UniProtKB/Swiss-Prot annotation:
Record family assignment: Belongs to the UPF0502 family.
Database matches in HAMAP family: UPF0502
Protein name stated in the entry: UPF0502 protein Mpe_A1449
Pfam family, one: DUF480
InterPro entries referenced in this protein's UniProt entry, alphabetically: DUF480, WH-like_DNA-bd_sf, WH_DNA-bd_sf
Species for this entry: Methylibium petroleiphilum (strain ATCC BAA-1232 / LMG 22953 / PM1)
Length: 233
C-alpha cells in the first residue's frame, strides 16, 4: 500500500547535497531505472551505463555523453556516496545508493528518478511513467509522496506554476538546482525581445557541456590531490 507518512509535516533537516550536474543526475537516475527494468544486468557496467545515459527514448533532454564524461560523473557520485563500485567482477560495475543517502523510500526514489530522466511532469504523468519502477495505486498516492518530498528540509521537489491553458501543475526535482520555468512573453513584446526555441536549446546545450567539463575537472583535481596526499575536504 502506498503511504507517504507525515506528508503534512516538515521533515527534519538532512545534510544537503551539492547541486548535481545534468550528467550526474542522468547517471544516478539510470542506475535506479535499470535496477528495475534490467535487473539481470544490475549492477551496471560502464558501457551499459553509458548506453542508458545516451538513450534516445524516455529522456529529456537527450544527451550524447562520452565514456570519459560518464566515468568522471561516476567518480564524483562515488565521493557523494550516491554511487557504489561493486567488487568481485572482472569488469567494474556500479550501483546506486540514492535511497540511503536521501533517506527516502522506493516510491519516492522512483518519482525522483523519473523527474531526473524526463524533466518536470504532472502527478498523472508520473504515475504512468513510473509504472516499471513502482506501481502507484492512484494519482493521489503520487501526490502524497510529492508533497512529502516538497516538505523535506531542504526540499527535493517543487510544484511549478501552472502554465496557461494547462489543467494540472507540473512538478520538478531540485537535485539539479532550481528548475527553469518558462514564462509567457508579455503582450506587445517586440520580436527582438523574444528568445527563440533554438536559442534556448543552444544555451542549454552549452550549459550542459560546461557542466560536464566541470565534473571532469573536479574528478581530475581529486585524483591529483590523492596522488599528492592532499586532503580537499
Amino acid at each position: 500500500m502506498d503511504s507517504a507518512s507525515d506528508a503534512g509535516e516538515r521533515r527534519p533537516a538532512r545534510a544537503a547535497l551539492r547541486v548535481l550536474s545534468l550528467i550526474e543526475q542522468r547517471v544516478v537516475a539510470v542506475l535506479v531505472e535499470k535496477q528495475h527494468t534490467v535487473s539481470d544486468s544490475y549492477p551496471l557496467s560502464l558501457n551499459t551505463l553509458l548506453l542508458g545515459c545516451n538513450q534516445k527514448t524516455a529522456r529529456e533532454p537527450v544527451i550524447n555523453a562520452t565514456e570519459s564524461e560518464v566515468l568522471a560523473a561516476v567518480d564524483e557520485l562515488k565521493r557523494l556516496s550516491l554511487v557504489i563500485e561493486v567488487s568481485g567482477s572482472r569488469v567494474a560495475r556500479y550501483e546506486h545508493n540514492l535511497q540511503r543517502v536521501l533517506g527516502v523510500p522506493s516510491q519516492a526514489a522512483a518519482i525522483l528518478t523519473l523527474l531526473m530522466l524526463r524533466g518536470p511532469q504532472t502527478a498523472a504523468e508520473l504515475r504512468a511513467n513510473t509504472e516499471r519502477l513502482h506501481r502507484f495505486a492512484d494519482i493521489s498516492s503520487v501526490e502524497g509522496f510529492l508533497d512529502e518530498l516538497a516538505l523535506r528540509e531542504p526540499p527535493l521537489v517543487v510544484k511549478l506554476p501552472r502554465a496557461p491553458g494547462s489543467r494540472e501543475a507540473r512538478w520538478a526535482q531540485l537535485l539539479g538546482g532550481p528548475p527553469e520555468v518558462s514564462v509567457a512573453a508579455p503582450a506587445g513584446a517586440a520580436p527582438e525581445d523574444l528568445v527563440t526555441a533554438g536559442e534556448i536549446q543552444a544555451l542549454r546545450a552549452n550549459q550542459h557541456r560546461l557542466q560536464a567539463e566541470v565534473v571532469m575537472l573536479r574528478a581530475q583535481l581529486h585524483r591529483l590531490a590523492a596522488e599528492l596526499g592532499v586532503d580537499l575536504s
